[in-house]
Amino acid sequence: MANLCTKSDYKAYKKIEHAKDDSQIDVLVTSISELVKTYCGSTLIDYYSSNKTETFDIFDAGTAEVFLTESPLVSVSSVQERDSITDSYTTLTANTDYYVDTEHDRIFRIDGDISSKAWSRGFASVQIVYRAGYSTTPQDLRLAIYDLITYYLKEEYKGRKSMAGATLQNETSTSIREDIGFPDHIKRVLDMYRVVDVM
């Protein structure tokens, strides 16, 4: 999976001209990219130009919509459904059998053009192939990622550091409820890209 920024992007932003921290920055770029993707619940850029196949288990007889994991939705290649795990998938027709809601990244099962219909029930009863995300990491998110790299590179997560007889006290608490440890200004940006599971 692709990193959300590169070492050279970070070094240019921070105006770093030396190479002494390059190996640590390389590790942080990869680790923080994965951390941000995990926290946001989306890969953000990985499926913008390549297909993602997602299957859904439907257990409720009244379920007429499914929410896709990746966001924002770019395109839908195919929507398929099956009645049981032993059956083959049947390909559905757009705007006749299903409707794509790009604003909310969801697919509705429909019956014609005026009413909804429940999806078939069962394990992996719905399979959708689609593309979603961003062509490049959005600039505001990129800024938060740079700040996270600095946060870990300079070990700002440590409450207290001693160096050459001086003590540096970092404020590790946050004013945000249910804090997970990110500084407030970074968490606010990450939360704008967070996909919340509605299931």
Locations of regions flagged by a protein language model:
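Divalent metal-cofactor coordination and adjacent catalytic microenvironments
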Residues: 1-199
